[in-house]
Amino acid sequence: MTFTIRHDWTIAEIQALLELPLMELLWQAQYVHRAANPGYRVQLASLLSVKTGGCEEDCAYCSQSIHNSSDVTAFEAQMQVEPVLQRARAAKEAGADRFCMGWAWREIRDGAPFEAMLSMVRGVRDLGMEACVTAGMLSDQQAERLAEAGLTAYNHNLDTSPEHYDRIISTRTYQERLETLQRVRKAGVTLCCGGIIGMGETLRDRASMLQVLASMAPHPESVPVNGLVAVEGTPLEDQAPFEPLELVRMVATARILMPRARVRLSAGRESMSREAQILCLQAGADSIFYGDTLLTTGNPDVEADRQLLADAGVQANWQECQTTA
């Protein structure tokens, strides 16, 4: 079995993949996945909101923005180092081997909050787990210090296509997102970068977002695929629910475009049937977020996920630290 790593996919080619009959798309994705990732296993990642609410950004989907009126927009102080590490230990005991930490910031703040972040990264790495941080934009020096602390990956999503982006956020440009990703790469930290469907975008928008990701050289090591969780008090609160099979198509297409990336089944999974989630695994998803909360939105509980993987006949990387994001 062979596959090709490409960075020259066109939007038209990607849209054609998204429009394939579902069974044909799944077959192609599974072929690429088996060729690129022998010994298929699912990585379990746990996600913790270290600093919740009070974010200056105006992302239309986000419950943590000060511009929105959800229940979690009020500022909460950053968690202390030891409670975060206690949560990391608990995540490891539950089977996760990657611990992701989120800060509701526009950009990383220097000083005590950043020093605490570095201590958290070191502590997670000392547990033998991968450490991922998502905290908005950052400087070259901050990226370098995170790399020195042992950070495995930095998450900074594109959210949507360049064409649809201004309908979702106005406080940060698409170019600023790309520049943040470049700083992370320059520091030697792996990228976790994906997007969200169900925000009123077109099929071409989805293809365009995937084209930006697939054009990166190298591809992002981790590609989270999210479905919108419509939160009361946000501009997208009345958005119609995304169609689960559309998320399956996004997973499959991401797998074809970026054969060796970890395609992460992320937010929105709680609203999907077990069968739709298993189809996502069949389509090439090889990571799930594990635990009953993703930052501020719900997620299937640990026991439900254990049963899901068992029923699918999929092995997880229980407490095995991987070298890729």
From Swiss-Prot:
Belongs to the radical SAM superfamily. Biotin synthase family. GO terms for molecular function: 2 iron, 2 sulfur cluster binding; 4 iron, 4 sulfur cluster binding; biotin synthase activity; iron ion binding. Catalyzes the conversion of dethiobiotin (DTB) to biotin by the insertion of a sulfur atom into dethiobiotin via a radical-based mechanism. Its EC number is 2.8.1.6. It is an enzyme of class 2 (transferase). Homodimer. Pathway: Cofactor biosynthesis; biotin biosynthesis; biotin from 7,8-diaminononanoate: step 2/2. It catalyses: (4R,5S)-dethiobiotin + (sulfur carrier)-SH + 2 reduced [2Fe-2S]-[ferredoxin] + 2 S-adenosyl-L-methionine = (sulfur carrier)-H + biotin + 2 5'-deoxyadenosine + 2 L-methionine + 2 oxidized [2Fe-2S]-[ferredoxin]. SMART domains: BATS (SM00876), Elp3 (SM00729). Residues 40-269 form the Radical SAM core domain. PANTHER family: BIOTIN SYNTHASE, BIOTIN SYNTHASE, MITOCHONDRIAL. Its cofactor is [4Fe-4S] cluster; [2Fe-2S] cluster. GO terms for biological process: biotin biosynthetic process. InterPro entries: Aldolase_TIM (IPR013785), BATS_dom (IPR010722), Biotin_synth/BioAB (IPR002684), Biotin_synthase (IPR024177), Elp3/MiaA/NifB-like_rSAM (IPR006638), rSAM (IPR007197). This is Biotin synthase.
